């Protein structure tokens, strides 16, 4: 049976939760036995978010095949429990680049290249490519931005055309909008939703379902009012009120009947949703009473979305151990000016990835504090590199040790540029990206965590442990517990005489799931629980 297509658009304002809505629907449809593919279309002109500031975009999520993508793909993977590909994130930049390349090659035979049909055809081709690659029952596509944005218009026009291209019975439109609650008036207001749907209909898209983000539930009468003005069935007005945890949203959507309406409208052949495991997970999350505080020492701590997958991975591990992980956000540059008291009473310290030299010395201070005080430590990517620098300086006596990224003239470049990176000048899409194998050493904490010899993890880096210093550092107590299969690249280091000090070059946070925490996060939180007292859950 040909794939059915579901398009999720947003109105009134950004950050309403289109991604969570799409991910929740994907989870519900998968639980019905359907094969689900999902993708995000972003209307910005960047080719990908790889070179964008985290302050503007949040986290860059990396797929198995090395795509640098929008953070919503992390939600998709965690909720639906699938691994996505480069085809799952399409930007306006990629679309225009492809069309311009074809024009330069002469593919359009001298014709005038226009937004319609050339840009819209390219968008539709990328929509259909996902269906061709994975042969799903359903393809869910989230359109980034807000209806009314100039940048979104070609994407909206493309999805409008889809209903005539492949048939109205294979297409369904979901519009996520805002129903604000005005405390002064003591009621919710539907006017923003009405205007947003009017804008959407003006470009030829009639939504089948409206998902209303709201602070609190509203009346059936208000649902009927929205249905009347927006020309949909009252049962297709779905309320999505504020939840304590994003993992409650699929259950909320199921209760509101979202998946049932989708199945009915698209005539999908499937069974009822099997959400018992998810429901049990959420119930466990709600019943947690024990708290555990972890210090996250980073550069972008004023914008937690910059570390979204790390935060979610800590929560997954917390659920496993029956604790709520509370994060103490510490701006790494503050530690360079003192402020060590911020680290004194935490159960664990995590130093995540990052770029640039601002705050680097503060991260080194955090790694040293964890090493000297026996505090469980997890370093990720740059966090591993700086743990190596700290060890070289303060244990091996290489006082000027550094990464050549931050000091090209250092006499001891314990972290250096990967050989294959030395001639590369472009910044975008040129790092060591995606899934690579790693061989673990038996008897190490890493091997104990994974329980297997060969693992596969996602990477995003240019710099690597300098093997010229491997013998010197291991002689002083550093353990190389994971390497590339050819032993050329150091992937994981740990300390032998420490309760739990592990750092990895890859990004374990991208493979954690709410019902299956990543082994390193799981054991890190387990060690933190033991330090806090009471043992791991």
UniProtKB/Swiss-Prot annotation:
Q: Active-site positions, per UniProt?
A: 381 (nucleophile), 507, 509
What's an example Gene Ontology biological process for this entry? pyrimidine nucleobase biosynthetic process
**Ligand binding (L-glutamine):** 55, 354, 382-385, 405, 462
Q: Does the UniProt entry include the keyword Signal?
A: no
Q: Part of which pathway? A: Pyrimidine metabolism; CTP biosynthesis via de novo pathway; CTP from UDP: step 2/2
Keyword match Metal-binding: yes
The annotated modulation of its activity is: Allosterically activated by GTP, when glutamine is the substrate; GTP has no effect on the reaction when ammonia is the substrate. The allosteric effector GTP functions by stabilizing the protein conformation that binds the tetrahedral intermediate(s) formed during glutamine hydrolysis. Inhibited by the product CTP, via allosteric rather than competitive inhibition.
Gene3D superfamilies per the UniProt record, alphabetical: 3.40.50.880, P-loop containing nucleotide triphosphate hydrolases
User: EC number(s) of the enzyme?
Assistant: 6.3.4.2
Q: Which domain of life is it from?
A: Bacteria
Q: Which residues bind Mg(2+)?
A: 72, 142
Q: Which residues bind UTP?
A: 14, 189-194, 225
Q: Which InterPro entries match?
A: Class_I_gatase-like (IPR029062), CTP_synthase (IPR004468), CTP_synthase_N (IPR017456), GATASE (IPR017926), GATase1_CTP_Synthase (IPR033828), P-loop_NTPase (IPR027417)
Chain positions recorded as CTP binding sites? 14, 149-151, 189-194, 225
Could you say which enzyme class this protein belongs to? ligase
Listed under subunit, the entry gives: Homotetramer.
The remark listed among the other comments is: CTPSs have evolved a hybrid strategy for distinguishing between UTP and CTP. The overlapping regions of the product feedback inhibitory and substrate sites recognize a common feature in both compounds, the triphosphate moiety. To differentiate isosteric substrate and product pyrimidine rings, an additional pocket far from the expected kinase/ligase catalytic site, specifically recognizes the cytosine and ribose portions of the product inhibitor.
- Protein name per the record: CTP synthase
Q: What is the native source organism of this protein?
A: Moorella thermoacetica (strain ATCC 39073 / JCM 9320)
What gene name does this entry carry? pyrG
